[in-house]
Amino acid sequence: MNTRSLALALLAGVGAVWTPHTALAGNPLGIDHKLNYDDSGIWKRSYQKQLAVGLALTTIGGALFADNDSRLGRTFDQSLDSMVLTAATTSVMKVAFSRERPSENADPGDFFDGRGHQSFPSGEVAEVTAVVTPFIAEYGDDHPAVWALALLPAYDAVARVKVNGHWQSDVIVGAAIGAAWGVWAHRRHSPLIMGLLPGHGMMIGYARRF
């Protein structure tokens, strides 16, 4: 799998969800505009939270319990690295840029407004992208259906904008960060986080050899 192509494909998937619209001046990518608030159906905020928490718990559980020497176990380890490094990156950027959310201010060009404003970039879209990228990179060629995982960050990106939690550029940059760390983690020969634990991980369970 060409990891550069993977990253571009993920970004294209997130970017493609936006239809042409008159954007307001003063925003980074020239695409930001506030959508009518929609917290109904599949866009409900509670579903977005469940997706983020579910993926995080699945990733942590997979890294802890899967055989670290197996293909699946290594991929979970890579997703864990990607998720944690992505979270660290977006957390720093949120504080540094202190951008107001659409729910707080209708002006997408309002950055550096101080503590408490954390719109840029989207941490949730970044997390979802970071988790799925290593799996797509690892299994995408053998099992093309795995590419369907790219729908998760695309869905989350649309949902975050619909509930006025983020601007369009927030979710696109978030996806870029998650994809970048996901590609980086997949290229590593050994996991970063699980590699620091005794015995190269904490696989729980048992294995039988005949």
Model-derived regions, located:
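Interfacial segments of alpha-helical transmembrane regions
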Residues: 62-88
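Hydrophobic alpha-helical transmembrane segments
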Residues: 48-65
